[in-house]
């Protein structure tokens, strides 16, 4: 027999349903991240693929991202702490490992801290994600660029963010 949404609500609280939805959305994104970061590509090629995947995922799974933003914005919530541990522990490890490997190969500037750079990279990608899905971030994007994110040429967004990331990973102060 098929179950309706009402049956789901009887078995779970609304909070449980939200968390289940967020976990599903994050599993989708994490699979893509793992696939990209496991490749033998150089870090900047991986970064471009991550940026592209973020754009696609943001449009395809906007509801998951909006829900994540809403729940992650709560103050002093056990649920927020649980989500951070569950979601961020995976991506932080994947990014940190990839950056540390690039550092060991000499593909990035030698003075970077892989953990901090992983955090900063994730912040850029998260901000991009929210710019496609959350009203505040959409308005923020429009304020800075003068263009609605939906009207902006996606290749321009990808290219400019990649230049920014590339300079962060390769530019050394002389």
Sequence positions of predicted segments:
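C-terminal peripheral helix-coil segments that are non-catalytic and often amphipathic
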Residues: 56, 89-93, 97-105, 123-174
């Amino acid at each position: 027999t098929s179950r309706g949404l009402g049956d789901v609500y009887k078995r779970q609280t609304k909070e449980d349903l939200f968390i289940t939805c967020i976990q599903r959305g994050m599993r989708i994104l994490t699979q893509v991240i793992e696939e990209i970061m496991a490749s033998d590509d150089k870090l900047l090629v991986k970064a471009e693929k991550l940026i592209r995947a973020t754009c696609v995922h943001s449009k395809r799974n906007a509801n998951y991202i909006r829900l994540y933003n809403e729940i992650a914005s709560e103050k002093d919530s056990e649920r927020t702490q649980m989500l951070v541990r569950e979601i961020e522990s995976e991506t932080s490890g994947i990014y940190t490992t990839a950056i540390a490997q690039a550092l060991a190969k000499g593909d990035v500037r030698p003075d970077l801290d892989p953990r901090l750079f992983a955090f900063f990279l994730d912040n850029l990608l998260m901000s991009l994600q929210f710019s496609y899905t959350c009203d505040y971030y959409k308005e923020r994007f429009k304020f800075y660029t003068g263009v609605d994110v939906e009207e902006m040429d996606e290749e321009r967004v990808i290219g400019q963010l990649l230049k920014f990331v590339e300079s962060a990973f390769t530019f050394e102060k002389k």
